[in-house]
Amino acid sequence: MWQIVFLTFGCDLVLASAYNNFRKSVDSTGRRQYQVQNGPCSYTFLLPETDSCRSSSSPYMSNAVQRDAPLDYDDSVQRLQVLENILENNTQWLMKLENYIQDNMKKEMVEIQQNVVQNQTAVMIEIGTSLLNQTAAQTRKLTDVEAQVLNQTTRLELQLLQHSISTNKLEKQILDQTSEINKLQDKNSFLEKKVLDMEDKHSVQLQSMKEQKDQLQVLVSKQSSVIDELEKKLVTATVNNSVLQKQQHDLMETVNSLLTMMSSPDYKSSVAVPKEEKTTFRDCAEIFKSGLTTSGIYTLTFPNSTEEVKAYCDMDMGGGGWTVIQHREDGSVDFQRTWKEYKEGFGSPLGEYWLGNEFVSQLTSGHRYVLKIQLKDWEGSEAHSLYEHFYLSGEESNYRIHLTGLTGTAGKISSISQPGSDFSTKDSDNDKCICKCSQMLTGGWWFDACGPSNLNGQYYPQKQNTNKFNGIKWYYWKGSGYSLKATTMMIRPADF
């Protein structure tokens, strides 16, 4: 009886079109193998050998078997047929099994494919969602980056605009500075030319001064000879003075005799009554004390002389008795005058005038006088400077001014240089500067080295009175460039 010892089969999960293949072989143990191939599935059958069957290694030949045992051959044929029938049945069964497996595998494959598709769909959806989230995140990041870029771009544009504006301003400033530099260069060239002209002029002046020096040296030598002659005359005059003293003594005796004779009653009756002498005044203080207390023009007499001068007397200011020696108020009188004019005086006592250096010198040299300087600016303010002691030296000392004891509201420091300065005019330069202050600053004054004051300078009207070097100035009240509106210089005895 044939028995199926072992059956193996294998099928791929993926089914293809079926095909049949049958192969017979013998393994190493001598057992027969039958392999059936149906599509992707293969089936192997291992059948045992019967006892009557000999191996192919038997020493006798098959023809001998057939010849010696004919009955065994028929049995073998029958058995083979049975076996083939069994094999055919098994093959059919296997085909059915294969069909069943194929049908089931199709369903399973469809399910597997559906599951795979579902899983893949879920994965794809998850991946898509993740990609969408990542895309949204990236989009947000890109939006933020874009906003930052826009902000940075806007900031850069604003900075660029500011830099452009700054550049334009700098260019304008550079152009203005270039223009200013060009102007300064032109002005510098003009000033250089002017300096060269001044140097030439100064050279000419120095040459002229050298010539004047030579002339002065000649004059000094002449004066030395004159002085020698004068000394001789002085000796002669001294001798004559003794004679004069004797004559004076004789005259005094004669006068005393005449006085004795005039005092006798007989002489008084025989001599007619003389006329009343004319009253004279040396200054306005004497006029005020005489009972004349109205401000106005009065006649004053030089000390020890009959020479007279008209002067304005201020009987109202500070107790009255003031003799006005200078007055400025409207620029109607030109104060750029000569030495002689300042010596004798000029102008009108009712307006602008200068009383005269000679009269003031003689008046103040023998008595102690007070000097008051009254000042008025263009804004309506007034100030004054009061000197407790004032006098002028004689013409031989160039009418040098002497002042002490300053008080008042026009500055704590005197604007008239101290110690005393000599008087200078346009034709008599007695200052301490080689520039001739009277010609440069105009007017006659005690300039010293063109000092801090000049009340006889050029008169400038309102709105033209600032930044004027040659105006009517009083430095320690209004500075050197301010020209005053009105000034008055007046004197009065210190014991008034």
Curated annotation (Swiss-Prot):
Signal sequence, renumbered to the chain: 1-18
Q: Which GO terms describe its biological process?
A: angiogenesis; animal organ regeneration; blood coagulation; blood vessel morphogenesis; cellular response to growth factor stimulus; gene expression; germ cell development; glomerulus vasculature development
Q: Which residues form a coiled coil?
A: 159-256
Q: Does the UniProt entry include the keyword Aminoacyl-tRNA synthetase? A: no
Per its UniProt record, what PROSITE patterns does this chain match? Answer: FIBRINOGEN_C_1, FIBRINOGEN_C_2
Residues annotated as domain Fibrinogen C-terminal = 280-496
List the NCBIfam families hit by this protein, alphabetically.
Answer: GGGWT_bact
- Recorded domain comment: The Fibrinogen C-terminal domain mediates interaction with the TEK/TIE2 receptor.
Assembly notes: Interacts with TEK/TIE2, competing for the same binding site as ANGPT1. Interacts with ITGA5. Interacts with SVEP1/polydom. Interacts with THBD; this interaction significantly inhibits the generation of activated PC and TAFIa/CPB2 by the thrombin/thrombomodulin complex.
Per its record, how is this protein called by name?
Answer: Angiopoietin-2
Which species?
Rattus norvegicus (Rat)
